[in-house]
């Protein structure tokens, strides 16, 4: 099972902040007057990963892959259908409501839309201070001080504490959301596309802020995004999801330099690069994403994969460690077989992509 | 293709971010700031609002006048509204009786003034009752969902399918004429519309990320409903409730006109009309004019106020669409 | 994945040098008159477009790029907006002087537009075949049957499989990528000279985005349509454009050929944007990851309270007094490279990777 703790040298024996095993979430589809169940949406279909202290796991995928569902299932905003989720070692799915409430202090979430993630009738200060109020931490005065400190930390002025959300810009609202997530001093913050709705120049500010906070507080992030460049920038490890399953999982550099799964290859090939001198040779995938209600049998990607074989159509490929600490779920990338030249590069750090001028 | 039209909201064209900043950082708050420090007092704020929404100010003034009239009734009338005096029966308006006298010799002015008490008591009573239970039902229905929602909605459907006046009449007839029964009979037809509005707001608010965030920090569902959902449903509710005041006054007048509403001894504009309209409209028109004008102005005032409140509350809600 | 990329030399688009100018916008001003004041959504915008050329207009939200396109097509909501000045010449004819009836003959016929959200831009109760044939019948004298055949032909052109069957389907039965293809088919059905594409791929997944961009480029080359691509994504610009205009606060601040813009920008905003975009390091061979992104401090200004002088001055590292007092003149600093900045000389060579 891919274990982030193995990859990071900083914390060799500590418990991973988040550990997910075979997480599944199936939504029933109800039709008709009697609302009979006619099928399921296999939103998350057996996902496993772990995040170590101070590390960021980037979870990428396109629409319908289930990454947002994973984000919510992992903190029980949605109840998983099955699987195991451990935060700091504790199995949170076995907790009672009261115990879960206390456990929530360890893991918080930031949302994508800066407009709807804040209650429009509460002042910014109230929003940020609410977690403290709910958990009855500190006196009123202490809470005020903590909120002021949080404002300062995320780059807002304490004088803005009494302003309402609509008086802030999108980037500032996102900062309020970050301050709210930090209020309880969690170990893990889940970012559900936290910068996708922001302008490029504001994105950079928020990404920098998140990275600074991580360094300062040794935070762990589960960073969900569809923008590969942003994910590459902020993550330590990256996992790629397709139709409810993780298809590839590796340390960031390894994944981007030598992707092993055809879908990852296709994703990387599709990203437009802001360098007009580099032109793409060809697109590596055609067609549309199948529906998660009726996923294709066997490997979900076989309908669009250039290399699909008969085995791919029948058997679900397991997530295997194809190269050291580089996991892929593809029949064509077996640890033993040597089918693709790209695989040989997986064990060697491709130095050609490293040499570059510093920023 | 659907190109934007003149109905397309600006923030969809220019871009939410700086439209929100433009629309808010200036209009209300900047004007407020420009108005100066004295606006921080409550009177200052009231004057500022009156300047910005003149019609609403008029509406508010009318409502306030009626409330004052109702409250100060004993002090502004010189005659007992129930005292009969056959000698001055059907007297025209004069100095002693500014609105004349009815067929029993009762001073019309004091009857109209005390009628305001009745009307307002019923209107406010019915509105408060209707809002209280409507919110309860709507919130529970929208938040809990499932069979609670299904069952409640069907009951609401049934209630709403009957016209307001007919339903009120049926209830009043069943309960019998009295002040409290009138209040109940008027409150019940109000329930469906309020419950519907609250339920609709609740349903959309329930899915909002800020509600998810509240859950993520461990807030109990009850607290979320009170602290996050309910305050955001207030805007349409206030508009509905204020407009409902006018309807309540009208319905009370209608019920009393039909004899099903507020009985003797409480003076009621509606009953005054029914007592005098058919027989005396030509011989003593003041008996019809004054109560009629009172009803008209009262409803007019509440409608103006309701419209202004909607204008005041809605644009600021737009940023959270 | 080095075998997927190849370096291309920055050859000038030689073939379009001799082509004629098909669209010329001069001094376009579109203002919105709202309670708060005047919103100068587009302020003095000028550019020209040659036949078959690919121009990108890039900027962040609220910079006026979408409104420029809507102004060209005269789709500005009036009230509260109005085109207050300028001219838009299509093949020599000033569109702003046409009557509404004449303008209707131009829209969809000589100039077309595709929008960001294909779901809301397609009529949900009409089949896509019917919508495309409607566009054809409006502008060409053909029977309904012929128009429908043309519609199916267009759907095949945009690579929708089983086009004849799909033509009878409704928008909600198609995926996002398909809908965008359908909208492209509708836009190109009458073979327009100019195609305006307003963020056509922003709402799509990245693999679908790549397909749609490829499609637009392929069709553009085949049909000879000039394309104005409006976007905020610099990657899309780099891949598709020959020339780029950068907008900020309703004004054009820089214009150049694409390679030159990316390698030697002359406006601090452009330079800031380029530095703020995280690049896929492995793909573009640039800076190592986990360094801080270069930020542009501050926020995009509200268009109704624009500062005097250069709109970018409050956020600009090079701003001086002259910047705050007067908007800089639009000058040609290098051949084919125009910029509006008092200090562009200082930026020469100061490109951060």
Give the ranges of each region predicted by the language model.
Chain B
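Short hydrophobic alpha-helical segments within the ABC transporter permease transmembrane module
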Residues: 111-115, 120, 155, 162, ...
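Glycine-rich helix-loop "coupling/hinge" segments at transmembrane-helix boundaries
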Residues: 160, 171-175, 186-187, 201-202, ...
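Generic hydrophobic transmembrane alpha-helix motif, especially the helices
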Residues: 98, 102, 108, 129-208, ...
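Gly/Trp-centered helix-boundary motif
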Residues: 1-135, 139, 146-147, 161, ...
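Residue-level recognition of transmembrane alpha-helices
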Residues: 63, 111, 153, 169-170, ...
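Transmembrane alpha-helices
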Residues: 117-133, 168, 172, 222-254, ...
């Amino acid at each position: 099972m891919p274990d982030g703790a193995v990859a990071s040298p900083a914390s060799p024996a500590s418990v991973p902040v988040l550990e997910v095993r075979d997480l599944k979430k199936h939504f029933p589809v109800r039709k008709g007057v009697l609302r009979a169940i006619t099928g399921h949406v296999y939103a998350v279909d057996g996902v496993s990963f772990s995040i170590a202290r101070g590390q960021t796991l980037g979870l990428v995928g396109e629409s319908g892959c289930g990454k947002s569902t994973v984000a919510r299932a992992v903190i029980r905003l949605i109840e998983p259908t099955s699987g195991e989720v451990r935060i700091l070692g504790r199995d949170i799915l076995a907790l009672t409501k009261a115990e879960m409430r206390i456990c929530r202090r360890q893991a918080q979430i930031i949302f994508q839309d800066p407009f709807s993630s804040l209650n429009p009738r509460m002042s910014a200060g109230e929003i940020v201070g609410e977690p403290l109020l709910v958990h009855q931490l500190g006196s009123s005065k202490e809470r005020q001080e903590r909120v002021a400190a949080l404002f300062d930390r995320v780059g807002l002025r304490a004088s803005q504490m009494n302003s309402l959300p609509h008086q802030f810009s999108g980037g500032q609202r996102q900062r309020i959301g970050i301050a709210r997530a930090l209020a309880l001093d969690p170990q893990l913050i889940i970012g559900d596309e936290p910068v996708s709705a922001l302008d490029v120049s504001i994105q950079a500010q928020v990404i920098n802020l998140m990275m600074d906070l991580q360094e300062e507080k040794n935070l762990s992030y589960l960073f969900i995004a569809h923008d590969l460049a942003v994910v590459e920038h902020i993550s330590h490890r990256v996992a790629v999801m397709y139709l409810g399953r993780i298809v590839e999982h590796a340390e960031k550099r390894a994944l981007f330099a030598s992707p092993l799964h055809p879908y990852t290859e296709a994703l990387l090939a599709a990203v437009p690069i802001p360098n007009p001198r580099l032109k793409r040779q060809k697109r590596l995938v055609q067609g549309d994403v199948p529906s998660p209600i009726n996923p294709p049998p066997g490997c979900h990607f076989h309908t669009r994969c250039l290399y699909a074989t008969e085995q791919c159509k029948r058997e679900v490929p397991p997530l295997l460690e194809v190269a050291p600490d580089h996991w892929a779920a593809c029949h064509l990338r077996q640890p033993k077989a040597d089918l693709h030249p790209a695989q040989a590069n997986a064990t060697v750090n491709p130095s050609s992509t490293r040499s570059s001028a510093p920023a | 293709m659907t190109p934007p039209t003149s109905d397309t909201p600006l923030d969809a064209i220019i871009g939410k971010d700086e439209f929100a900043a433009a629309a808010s950082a200036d209009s209300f708050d900047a004007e407020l700031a420009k108005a100066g420090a004295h606006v921080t007092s409550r009177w200052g704020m009231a004057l500022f609002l009156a300047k910005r929404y003149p019609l609403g100010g008029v509406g508010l003034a009318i409502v306030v006048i009626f409330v004052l009239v109702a409250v100060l009734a004993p002090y502004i009338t010189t005659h007992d509204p129930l005292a009969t005096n056959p000698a001055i029966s059907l007297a025209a308006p004069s100095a002693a009786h500014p609105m004349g006298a009815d067929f029993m010799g009762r001073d019309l002015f004091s009857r109209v003034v005390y009628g305001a008490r009745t009307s307002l008591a019923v209107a406010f009573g019915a509105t408060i009752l209707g809002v209280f239970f409507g919110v309860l039902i709507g919130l529970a229905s929208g938040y809990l969902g499932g069979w609670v929602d299904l069952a409640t909605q069907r009951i609401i459907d049934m209630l709403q399918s009957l016209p307001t006046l007919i339903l009120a009449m049926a209830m009043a007839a069943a309960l019998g004429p009295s002040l409290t029964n009138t209040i109940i009979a008027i409150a019940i037809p109000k329930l469906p519309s309020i419950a519907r509005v609250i339920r609709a707001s609740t349903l959309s608010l329930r899915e909002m990320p800020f509600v998810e965030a509240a859950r993520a920090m461990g807030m109990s569902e009850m607290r979320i409903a009170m602290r996050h959902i309910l305050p955001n449903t207030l805007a349409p509710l206030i508009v509905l409730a204020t407009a409902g005041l006018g309807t309540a006054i009208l319905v009370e007048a209608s019920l009393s006109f039909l004899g099903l509403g507020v009985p003797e001894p409480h003076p009621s504009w509606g009953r005054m009309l029914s007592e005098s309209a058919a027989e005396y409209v030509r011989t003593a028109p003041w008996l019809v004019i004054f109560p009629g004008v009172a009803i008209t102005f009262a409803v007019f005032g509440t409608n103006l106020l309701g419209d202004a409140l909607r204008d005041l509350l809605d644009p600021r809600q737009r940023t959270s669409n | 994945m080095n075998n997927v990329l190849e370096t291309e030399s920055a050859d000038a688009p030689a073939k379009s040098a001799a082509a004629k100018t098909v669209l010329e916008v001069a001094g376009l001003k579109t203002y919105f008159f709202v309670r708060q004041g005047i919103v100068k959504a587009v302020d003095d915008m000028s550019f020209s477009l040659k036949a078959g050329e690919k121009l990108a207009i890039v900027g962040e939200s609220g910079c006026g790029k979408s409104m420029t396109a809507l102004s060209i097509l005269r789709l500005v909501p009036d009230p509260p907006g109005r085109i207050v000045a300028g001219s838009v010449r299509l093949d020599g004819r000033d569109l702003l002087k046409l009557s509404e009836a004449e303008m209707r003959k131009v829209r969809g016929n000589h100039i077309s537009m595709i929008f960001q959200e294909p779901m809301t831009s397609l009529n949900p109760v009409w089949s896509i075949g019917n919508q495309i044939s409607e566009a054809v019948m409006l502008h060409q004298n053909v029977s309904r049957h012929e128009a429908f055949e043309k519609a199916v032909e267009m759907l095949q052109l945009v690579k929708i499989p089983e086009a004849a069957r799909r033509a009878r389907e409704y928008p909600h039965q198609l995926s996002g990528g398909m809908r965008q293809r359908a909208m492209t088919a509708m836009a190109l059905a009458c073979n327009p000279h100019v195609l305006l594409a307003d963020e056509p791929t922003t709402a799509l997944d990245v693999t679908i985005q790549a397909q749609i961009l490829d499609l637009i480029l392929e069709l553009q080359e085949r049909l000879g349509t000039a394309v104005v691509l409006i976007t905020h994504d610099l990657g899309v610009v780099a891949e598709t454009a020959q020339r780029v205009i950068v907008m900020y606060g309703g004004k054009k601040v820089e214009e150049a050929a694409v390679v030159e813009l990316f390698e030697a920008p002359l406006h601090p905003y452009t330079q800031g944007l380029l530095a703020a975009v995280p690049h896929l390091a492995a793909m573009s061979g640039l800076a190592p990851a986990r360094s801080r992104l270069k930020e542009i401090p501050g926020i995009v200004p509200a268009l109704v309270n624009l500062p005097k002088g250069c709109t970018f001055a409050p956020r600009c590292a090079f701003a001086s007094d002259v910047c705050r007092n007067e908007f800089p003149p639009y000058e040609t600093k290098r051949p084919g490279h125009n910029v509006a900045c008092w200090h562009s000389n200082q930026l020469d060579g100061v490109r951060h990777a």
